[in-house]
């Protein structure tokens, strides 16, 4: 029986659909007597979480799109600090009674969180709130041609196609993050 759920989201407040679902699911699970940890990149922690039984674990890091571009690039590709902090948390929990529920990890955290879950041998559930895990644009759309993209996600044509609404370098960054 599951006793511990680690909910992962970049932010500890509602800033869109992913945040709303992550926070509301954490609260609902805690109300059912589940031991819930909310692992996030930054606050401020919303009042709903503050006034609940949910335990907050934050890396207290900034958004990768703010501040130094080099720091953001490195943090976005491999957020080693978040990986280590999550692994430390997971080591404290019974892996037979714990799951990790991921919502959003692209603005502060990174896919390095999955290295921590794999190393800790804890199962992961992902609620996809967009297509960012398979499409570098996050929406299967060619912004240059203003049409739906027909490329195989992350296939050769997809990778070389300049379809981003910004510059190709942004798409390349998002592709690198996937691997």
What are these regions (language model features)?
Residues 2, 13-15, 28-80, 89:
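N-terminal strand-loop element at the rim of the active site
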Residues 8, 39-41, 127-128:
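Generic beta-sheet signal
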Residues 9-23:
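A short, glycine/small-residue-rich beta-strand->loop->alpha-helix junction that serves as a flexible
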Residues 19-20, 48-52, 69, 112-114, ...:
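Short aromatic-enriched loop/helix-cap "lid" or pocket-rim segments at secondary-structure transitions
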Residues 25, 29-30, 117:
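Hydrophobic alpha-helical packing residues
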Residues 32, 120-122:
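Helix C-cap/helix->beta junction micro-motif
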Residues 65-69, 126-179:
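Acceptor-binding helix/loop patch of EC 2.4 sugar-transfer enzymes
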Residues 89-109, 123-127:
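Short N-terminal targeting/anchoring amphipathic segment
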């Amino acid at each position: 029986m599951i006793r511990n759920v680690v909910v992962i989201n970049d932010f500890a407040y509602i800033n869109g659909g992913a945040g709303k679902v992550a926070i509301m699911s954490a609260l609902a699970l805690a109300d059912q007597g589940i031991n819930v940890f909310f692992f996030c990149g930054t606050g401020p922690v919303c009042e709903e979480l503050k006034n609940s039984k949910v335990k907050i674990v934050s890396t207290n890091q900034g958004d990768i799109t703010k501040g130094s571009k080099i720091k953001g690039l490195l943090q976005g590709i491999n957020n080693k600090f978040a990986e280590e902090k999550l692994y430390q948390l997971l080591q404290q929990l019974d892996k037979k009674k714990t799951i990790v529920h991921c919502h959003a990890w692209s603005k502060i955290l990174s896919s390095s969180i999955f290295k921590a879950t794999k190393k800790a041998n804890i199962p992961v559930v992902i609620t996809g709130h967009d297509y960012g895990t398979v499409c570098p644009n996050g929406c299967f759309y060619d912004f240059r041609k203003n049409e739906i993209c027909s490329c195989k996600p992350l296939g050769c044509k997809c990778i070389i196609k300049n379809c981003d609404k910004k510059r190709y370098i942004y798409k390349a960054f998002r592709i690198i993050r996937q691997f």
